[in-house]
Amino acid sequence: MAWPDLDPPRLAERPLSLQEALFVLEAPPEALPALAEAAIRVKEYFFGRRLKLVRLLNVKSGFCPEDCAYCAQSARSQAAIARYPLLSLEEILERAEEAQRLSARRFCLVAALRGPTPKVLERLGEAAQAIKARFPLELCASLGLLEEGMAEALKAAGFDYYNHNLNTAPSLYPRIATTHTYQDRLWTLKRAREAGLKLCSGVILGMGEGPKEVYEMALALRELGVESLPVNFLLPIPGTPLGDGRTVAGLTPERALKALILFRLLNPKAELRASAGRERYLGPYEPLAFRMVNSIFLQGYLTQPGSPWERDRALWESLDLDVEEGACG
């Protein structure tokens, strides 16, 4: 087929069709530079050259009753990770100060749970109020499934975003988790939206999906209108059901970059984040990825290490990207 129309305003008005998306995902190597430049143009049209730095904090580790196949903290996991109970208010504030020193713009508080307990809501509510009083940080909570009133409590405490990833396509979801459904995740995002929280929701690539499922994920997130969209690449963790790495065997740097390009083109106004696994899978294309995304995670993920801060800083400085600063609006 002929090249699709990749004009930024047009992409904002009408999503790519499945056929156009497959053109991107199945493009030959010689087309990759032009596709990457198109994605970069989209990013710069809507956001300029800004890059937002995001820091994660696992406020409790392990002991999750859910059975997500990718997760080292799940009920099915035998992974050798640190397991600890809910951090104290003082520990959370110390880590917020560290995030501020690292030039982070957003601080994400994460707990592996089916949903937040009253104790978790109280502790993180206190933390949010204290952080907002001291640091110019955007705040995001990721605490599992939300019941009535929980999103409102988080919003009132000062949280700006709620993260709840869709992770994969609906047709593949039963392979990934059985203790909750894809629809449960959609309901949680709906509750967060109704409470006035901005939505952070994304995917984990490398869990057995094909090109059509990648398109399905990117289109679903567009239809939800998510403000923040993390694209993760599976880090197989020994001791988890996906720990043997069989599902990522074909995830080459070219395929990883083309997937990121598609998420950019289908979600031109979303804050796209190159998330877990970018260091491993993007390889020589990581500089291109930095130019087409809005944000990156700093210094690792929930249970896995990431890129050193100094390395990432050298990369964004070499690309002349503008790191976001200032009080959150």
Curated annotation (Swiss-Prot):
Protein origin, superkingdom: Bacteria
Chain ranges of the Radical SAM core domain: 46-275
Enzyme type, top EC level: transferase
Catalyzed reactions per annotation: (4R,5S)-dethiobiotin + (sulfur carrier)-SH + 2 reduced [2Fe-2S]-[ferredoxin] + 2 S-adenosyl-L-methionine = (sulfur carrier)-H + biotin + 2 5'-deoxyadenosine + 2 L-methionine + 2 oxidized [2Fe-2S]-[ferredoxin]
SUPFAM superfamilies on file: Radical SAM enzymes (SSF102114)
InterPro entries: Aldolase_TIM (IPR013785), BATS_dom (IPR010722), Biotin_synth/BioAB (IPR002684), Biotin_synthase (IPR024177), Elp3/MiaA/NifB-like_rSAM (IPR006638), rSAM (IPR007197)
Associated pathway: Cofactor biosynthesis; biotin biosynthesis; biotin from 7,8-diaminononanoate: step 2/2
E.C. number(s) listed in UniProt: 2.8.1.6
GO annotation, biological process: biotin biosynthetic process
Binding site for [2Fe-2S] cluster: 108, 140, 200, 273
Signal peptide: none
Keywords associated with the record: 2Fe-2S, 4Fe-4S, Biotin biosynthesis, Iron, Iron-sulfur, Metal-binding, S-adenosyl-L-methionine, Transferase
Cofactors named for this entry: [4Fe-4S] cluster; [2Fe-2S] cluster
Residues at which [4Fe-4S] cluster binds: 64, 68, 71
General function of this protein: Catalyzes the conversion of dethiobiotin (DTB) to biotin by the insertion of a sulfur atom into dethiobiotin via a radical-based mechanism.
Subunit: Homodimer.
Family stated for the protein in its record: Belongs to the radical SAM superfamily. Biotin synthase family.
The name this protein goes by in its record: Biotin synthase
Gene: bioB
